[in-house]
Amino acid sequence: MSKQLAAQVPAEPVVLGKMGSSYGIRGWLRVFSSTEDAESIFDYQPWFIQKAGQWQQVQLESWKHHNQDLIIKLKGVDDRDAANLLTNCEIVVDSSQLPALEEGDYYWKDLMGCQVVTAEGYDLGKVIDMMETGSNDVLVIKANLKDAFGIKERLVPFLDGQVIKKVDLATRTIEVDWDPGF
């Protein structure tokens, strides 16, 4: 099915998607892509999965659209039983495979866990998720336990220059112009 590569494992793993249920009897699987354009997941190779705590490299043999789904065929996965063993496995690549971004652009993975503070120094909390709304991305911030406003979660639009004043990935902080009461 796949070969284990002790020497070649992702140094900085990034999850790009997940394998879904098997499709048919010849080892095809549904795939759920987390990339902005769903088909972009196929641009990043090799893929790694984790089985029983060990990294394994899997090779994409083929992929195609089926109704609303993307389905994949992996080398060495030739029947439904082998495919079922991979259901729910995350598709991982090394972050070095991702393209470099322009100044002011960030990967969501880099913003996760950043502390968010207002320009006045009020600690809003930590980024726990991101949402795509169509017009702009939104930071989902888990507020600190002793938040002065009693807020558990904040949604702050990622509008560079307007709301987002400074992103410092080295110190893992994001400075925002935002009313802590919201």
Curated annotation (Swiss-Prot):
UniProt keyword terms in alphabetical order: Chaperone, Cytoplasm, Ribosome biogenesis, rRNA processing
Gene Ontology biological process terms in this record: ribosomal small subunit biogenesis; rRNA processing
GO molecular function per UniProt: ribosome binding
Broad class of the protein's primary localization: cytoplasm
Domain PRC barrel: 103-182
Cellular component aspect of the GO annotation: cytoplasm; ribosome
Localization, UniProt: Cytoplasm
Record flagged with keyword Ion transport: no
Keyword Lyase attached: no
Domain comment, as recorded: The PRC barrel domain binds ribosomal protein uS19.
Similarity comment: Belongs to the RimM family.
Assembly description: Binds ribosomal protein uS19.
Record function comment: An accessory protein needed during the final step in the assembly of 30S ribosomal subunit, possibly for assembly of the head region. Essential for efficient processing of 16S rRNA. May be needed both before and after RbfA during the maturation of 16S rRNA. It has affinity for free ribosomal 30S subunits but not for 70S ribosomes.
Identification of the protein by name: Ribosome maturation factor RimM
Organism name: Salmonella paratyphi B (strain ATCC BAA-1250 / SPB7)
